[in-house]
């Protein structure tokens, strides 16, 4: 399984330095809003398969759209999710990590509208994250052809909601290849 690094990547030099440490993929988020060409630059240097764009979204009930946020979910970018993802693909992104930050860590289950959003982006691999409530839900989401992976945090780090840390692994056969 390839290891992906994300955080404070502001230049091709930053990305190259991390890859030289043995990391296969670079995930960028906030840096691309300051310099969208960073996607192309990293993709040209390291390859699109090593260029992961982390897209953090919040659902806007009034606009009935997912809006993209940067800076750990603190800053609205003005982009609607599909518009931003399409731009990232055009610039050379090879993979999208799409996170519903309203659901992240809540155990409420993934927002169905969020899953439908992912279905609209099928040109490159997409990993979904944010609110998975159970292994059964994870397996169900992974059955969609358009989902290449899931980001699971609390589900594999806690025994149950509001409980202490207890790393746990799904039993064999719960989530199939």
Task: Please report, for each region that a protein language model flagged, where it lies by residue.
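Alpha-helix-loop-beta-strand connector modules within alpha/beta enzyme cores
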Residues: 1-4, 40-56, 108-134, 174-177
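Catalytic cores of alpha/beta
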Residues: 2-5, 9-26, 113-150
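A cross-domain feature marking catalytic cores of carbohydrate-active enzymes
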Residues: 5-9, 30, 55-57, 100, ...
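Short secondary-structure boundary/capping elements
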Residues: 6-10, 34, 76-80, 107-110, ...
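Short, well-ordered secondary-structure micro-motifs
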Residues: 16, 38-40, 63-67, 107-109, ...
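Conserved anion-binding
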Residues: 19, 23-98, 102-103
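Short gly/pro/ser/thr-enriched loop/turn and capping motifs at secondary-structure boundaries
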Residues: 33-34, 60, 134, 156-159
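C-terminal helical cap(s) of enzyme catalytic domains, especially alpha/beta-barrels
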Residues: 38-45, 138-177
């Amino acid at each position: 399984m390839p290891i992906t690094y994300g955080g404070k990547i502001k230049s091709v030099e930053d990305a190259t330095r991390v890859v030289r440490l043995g990391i296969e993929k670079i995930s960028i988020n906030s840096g691309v809003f300051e310099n969208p060409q960073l996607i192309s630059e990293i993709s040209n240097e390291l390859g699109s398969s090593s260029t992961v764009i982390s897209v953090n979204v919040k659902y806007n009930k009034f606009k009935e759209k997912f809006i993209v946020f940067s800076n750990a979910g603190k800053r609205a970018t003005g982009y609607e999710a599909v518009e931003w993802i399409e731009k990232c693909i055009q610039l050379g992104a090879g993979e999208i990590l799409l996170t519903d930050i309203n659901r992240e860590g809540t155990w409420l289950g993934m927002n169905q509208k969020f899953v439908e959003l992912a279905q609209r982006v099928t040109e490159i691999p997409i990993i979904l994250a944010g609110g998975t409530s159970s292994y059964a839900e994870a397996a169900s989401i992974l059955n969609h052809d358009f989902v290449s992976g899931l980001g699971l945090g609390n589900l594999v780090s806690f025994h149950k909601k509001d409980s202490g840390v207890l790393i746990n692994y799904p039993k064999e056969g719960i989530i199939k290849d």
